[in-house]
Structures are given as structure tokens and as C-alpha cells.
Amino acid sequence: MRKIKRDDEVIVIAGRDKGKRGKVVRVLAEDRLIVSGINMIKKHQKPNPQLGVAGGIVEKEAAIHASNVAIYNPATKKADRVGFKILENGNKVRVFKSNGEAVEA
């Protein structure tokens, strides 16, 4: 089970976008994430009329390493760490380390 999953709200703790918040769009291999509105790059897109893609300079999100983000805790309104807890019924859930509340998935 991963500590950061798709649709989690994260806050950037290192890099040029430090302090910005965004939602995880995709989790890639090698502990990399694509977060909406974070780590924006300009890609020079070649036109492809067969696919209906116009050419030009397109702005899109690039991957960011998971160590540079932390999950956002809405209760404390701060970055937080994530741990795991096994409930009585045997389910494993993610919990915030600061207050022990379950992470909303």
C-alpha cells in the first residue's frame, strides 16, 4: 500500500514550487507523481493533423519526486506524514502521524 495515492491533496515541501498545494493526478513508477498545477513545463508540440493536435507551445505538468511532497492534513492545515493502522476488522488504513485520523481516500 502506497503512502500517497491518486486524488490525495499534497503540498510541495522542496523545490521551486515549495508551499503550493495540488491534487495528485497520477502516480508513476520510481516514486514519481504528477500533481495538478505543480512543476509546470513548456513543451514544444509538433502539429499532428491525423490526431487533430495543433502545434505550438503547450504548458503541462511534469513529474515530481514523492520525497518533495507531503500529504496535506485538512485538520491541521499543514503538511503531515502518513502511517498505517490495522483496524479490528482487519482492514489496513492510512492515518496521519500528527493526530491519528484516517486519511480520506
Curated annotation (Swiss-Prot):
The keyword RNA-binding applies. It comes from the Bacteria. InterPro entries: KOW (IPR005824), Rib_uL2_dom2 (IPR014722), Ribosomal_uL24 (IPR003256), Ribosomal_uL24_CS (IPR005825), Ribosomal_uL24_KOW (IPR041988), Translation_prot_SH3-like_sf (IPR008991). Keywords: Ribonucleoprotein, Ribosomal protein, RNA-binding, rRNA-binding. GO terms for molecular function: rRNA binding; structural constituent of ribosome. Pfam families: KOW, ribosomal_L24. Part of the 50S ribosomal subunit. This is Large ribosomal subunit protein uL24. It comes from Cellvibrio japonicus (strain Ueda107). The gene is rplX.
